[in-house]
Amino acid sequence: MLDKRFIGHTMPAFSAEVEKGRLRFFAKATGQTDPVYTDEAAARTAGYPSLPVPPTFLFCLEMESPNPAAIRDLLGMDYRSLLHGEQGFTYHAMAFAGDTLTFEQRIDDIYDKKGGALEFVVRKTRVSNQRAELVAELRTVTVMRNG
């Protein structure tokens, strides 16, 4: 069983720069057809300072943590039994190419179902920009199958 004493545990914050080339690649890979995601002139015409961050791109940047497996390692979770359970995004402000975003992760909850056959770890991540403005809150649920 996962140790519930880790609920509330925070990981070291880390920062990542939003790069234009990666935004364009992500927009193309996810089928974004609005030119504001790939053409800087179109973005400026639309009133943006630069290319806007497409939906869900923050998950990619979150994976740039110095140790993306830190929470799983901390809890001793076996990779062979992990499933991606759920993911959600709450946006508070837009982010753009050139921004430096800071990610602060915390274990928000640990619980089980089916008599412990399934254990769930809820991670919440606050994302803020270089002006310390809250950009988004990410919620990820990882499921561990036991037995």
Language model regions located:
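HotDog/MaoC-like acyl-thioester-processing domains
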Residues: 1-2, 91-147
